[in-house]
Amino acid sequence: MLDCIKNRYSPRSYLNKEVEQAKIDEVISAGLRAPSGRDLQQGIVICITNKEVRNNLAKLNASIAGMPEGVDPFYGARVVLLVAHKVSPLSDLNGAAMIENMLLEAQNQGLHARWINRGKKELETSEGKNILKMVGLNPDEYVGVDHVILGYSNEEPSIKEVKPNRVFYIK
């Protein structure tokens, strides 16, 4: 497991290559198995592979971030996993655990993944609420967390060094 963690990186460019459904399913399964407060398991994953929906979400995300028109905040990845959670004081924490599990399982599956922010703000907009409605969820009951983008990297791996002096012991 530690090798998987050490070798994981977040590419900024993805190949225009389809991701196998079985691999997507395994990544999602890992997210759904993340720990959650009181084991309520209220986090959800919306898997977006529809090109039009994905591109509209990318435009919304870029707009929220103040990116110039035409910039793809999903870096060309064909799969966007939008993590949301039932409204709760633990939404961010539970959702973050789901995202971390999915990032690691993507690496395990030979995929590349990146955590993309602004999910909360997206689902506060009418466009974001429509995504929840598309899958039959009540937008008033869910808050956005963030995204995991999946695909195959178009870059050489760049493993970053761990910054020193970040662990302290009390014995």
Q: Where is each model-derived feature located?
A:
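Acidic, surface-exposed loops and disordered segments
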Residues: M1-K171
